[in-house]
């Protein structure tokens, strides 16, 4: 009898915990939906400053300084979630192949590689594999997810880093195109971004 009472109490407590968890999940919008609201077309992009490790610009790169010279494309990669991301490599390769088309439109492309501070430089070097990025591309590091968190793009799940994202900013820093991928795929192609310019 005592075992039956304990089992009933356990079942009731489990149901209560499950109900609370389900109601909290129902009330909390998905992180991607939050990011889509914060990064909606017409919004002004938050300024940031990140270290360049390759490409046209060097040193600390500040978005507002780059944006003062024209339109900017911001591409957020996944970084190193335990291995180098083949979809990120393909996307960067696509932008490299189309670099002259972005230059012809007086548009800078900032590729952001997020990750924990430890080993981020090493992982970025592995990702680039000695590739020299042509102008107008610049490869930036986001140590400790400072940028990623500020933009609401942190993919906080095991072996994940950031939601792959592409933003196109006009000369005033307003978002005129945004694509946030909820999976590893569904990235913006260079052609899609060039069309948005």
Annotate each predicted stretch with a short phrase.
Residues 1-11:
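Bacterial N-terminal signal peptides that target proteins for export
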Residues 27-65, 90, 94:
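N-terminal "domain-start" segment that seeds a small globular fold
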Residues 22-26:
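Boundary at the C-terminal end of the N-terminal hydrophobic targeting segment
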Residues 161-197:
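Thiol-/selenol-based redox modules, centered on thioredoxin-like
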Residues 134-137, 154-167:
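Structural micro-motif
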Residues 63-95:
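Short active-site neighborhood of thiol/selenol oxidoreductases, capturing the structured segment around
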Residues 9-21:
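Bacterial N-terminal signal peptides
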Residues 84-135, 146-148:
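Structural microenvironment flanking redox-active thiols in thiol-disulfide oxidoreductases
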